[in-house]
Amino acid sequence: MVDKTSDSGRCPAVVLAGGRSSRMGSPKAAVLLGGQTMLDRVIERLSPQVASIAVNLNAHSGGALPSGHPAIADTIPGLPGPLAGVLAAMRHARQVAPGASHVLTVPIDAPFFPGTLAARLQGALIVGDEIAVAWSLGEMHPLFALWPLAIADDLDSWIRTDEKRRVRAFIARHASVAVDFPVVATKAGPLDPFLNVNTPQQLEEAEEWLNRLEDSAI
Ligand SMILES: Nc1nc2c(ncn2[C@@H]2O[C@H](COP(=O)(O)OP(=O)(O)OP(=O)(O)O)[C@@H](O)[C@H]2O)c(=O)[nH]1
Ligand SMILES: [Mg+2]
């Protein structure tokens, strides 16, 4: 059986922010929601859950961000798609947390993701070497996942050969467990905790949810 976690009992995490943000029109990491950048918001939500946080910025040449978290480039430059970021996350985790069996990934554009994300994904591992993936409302959220570091070499060769590089297709190659997260009950109705903010209009909607949520802890 593989260790479910790092030595601290918490896993390392990587925020996936290496996309083009073409629908938003400007980098989503720097977009403001409730007066805070999306990156700061995601880091704030993730910090109590994990052992360490790095940020995948695709072609970024490395170094630290203003928040002090390391920025990591894709390990295979020029291959589009989020799996390039997942691979970079696996390689990074192997370096910074040699005892860890998995790395958690969280995309930059889902500002209300659960505060129990890491604990519930880790707790769902059965044998210990599976991918644990978040679901809500009957839909898979494949970038909210705990990835076993042992499958990094398989991902490395698979993304070089499979042109579509679909995240779901890669998950289907391996043992996985699904973890269902409930909607968040608010006075204004149910909120999908994985609400995705890709466009300026969705950003406005997220701002409205934030105002409604002011009194309710999520
Ligand atoms: N490293 C890396 N990450 C990516 C790439 N494309 C998408 N991602 C990440 O995958 C996640 C989901 O992708 P999208 O929601 O489509 O984000 P996006 O590609 O920035 O936005 P669009 O250009 O509007 O599709 C985001 O967290 C991105 O940062 C890529 O080419 N390389
Ligand atoms: Mg998105």
Swiss-Prot record:
Mg(2+) binds at residue 109. It comes from the Bacteria. GO terms for cellular component: cytoplasm. It is found in: Cytoplasm. It catalyses: Mo-molybdopterin + GTP + H(+) = Mo-molybdopterin guanine dinucleotide + diphosphate. Its cofactor is Mg(2+). GO terms for molecular function: GTP binding; metal ion binding; molybdenum cofactor guanylyltransferase activity. Its main location: cytoplasm. GO terms for biological process: bis(molybdopterin guanine dinucleotide)molybdenum biosynthetic process. GTP binds at residues 16-18, 28, 56, 74, 109. Keywords: Cytoplasm, GTP-binding, Magnesium, Metal-binding, Molybdenum cofactor biosynthesis, Nucleotide-binding, Transferase. Belongs to the MobA family. NCBIfam families: molyb_mobA. Transfers a GMP moiety from GTP to Mo-molybdopterin (Mo-MPT) cofactor (Moco or molybdenum cofactor) to form Mo-molybdopterin guanine dinucleotide (Mo-MGD) cofactor. Monomer. The N-terminal domain determines nucleotide recognition and specific binding, while the C-terminal domain determines the specific binding to the target protein. This is Molybdenum cofactor guanylyltransferase. The gene is mobA.
